[in-house]
A protein has these predicted regions:
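Alpha-helical transmembrane segments and immediately membrane-proximal extracytoplasmic
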Residues: 1-177
Length: 177
């Protein structure tokens, strides 16, 4: 009986490790995408200072980003905003979301919106990206509700830690929730 409990705990620990590693990769990609997108927009503004016709391209680009972001939010309203309220509700068992549609829309939409310079920091979206990865691993491993919430919290704390570059901030978030 004790061996089975130990094996279950080791499996959960390995799954949590997988969640942490995947979250670090995805949030790293997220931050890299934001940096490159911001650089692209800065380059367009430099071109526009040399030739005002580039402002037309900038306006078209802003409209395209707004349309894409609006489309993502219309498809899945929980993609909009920071994602922290959704993660809290999921941890409390009051909200159930499909993890993969949220993951890729939040990743691409967040890169576009934050990289364009709109008022949203990467911390909340990173937290939600991590929690969706935790949910995905839990579903893939067919975990029960309790262990799913543990992996959700693991992903959320990993995302927050990766966003701030501070592991203790993620651990404190999980303890608070």
């Amino acid at each position: 009986m004790k061996d089975e409990a130990n094996r279950t705990n080791i499996k959960l620990l390995l799954q949590a490790l997988l969640v942490g590693i995947c979250t670090a990769v995805v949030v790293g990609l997220f931050r890299f995408g934001i940096e490159k997108t911001s650089g692209f927009w800065l380059y367009l503004f430099q071109l526009a200072h040399q030739n005002p016709l580039w402002f037309i391209a900038i306006i078209i680009g802003f409209i395209a980003v707004a349309v894409i972001a609006g489309y993502f939010v219309k498809q899945y309203p929980h993609v909009g905003g920071s994602g922290i309220p959704e993660v809290k509700l999921q941890l409390q068992g009051k909200l159930s979301l499909q993890w993969f549609p949220i993951l890729w829309r939040k990743l691409i939409g967040g890169i576009l919106v934050i990289g364009t310079g709109l008022f949203l920091g990467p911390e909340g979206p990173s937290l939600q990206l991590g929690s969706t990865i935790g949910q995905g691993v839990a579903q893939g491993c067919k975990q029960n509700k309790l262990k799913t919430r543990i992996l959700l919290a693991t992903g959320a704390s990993s995302g927050l830690s990766a966003a701030f570059g501070a592991p203790l901030s993620g651990a404190l978030f999980v303890l608070e929730e």
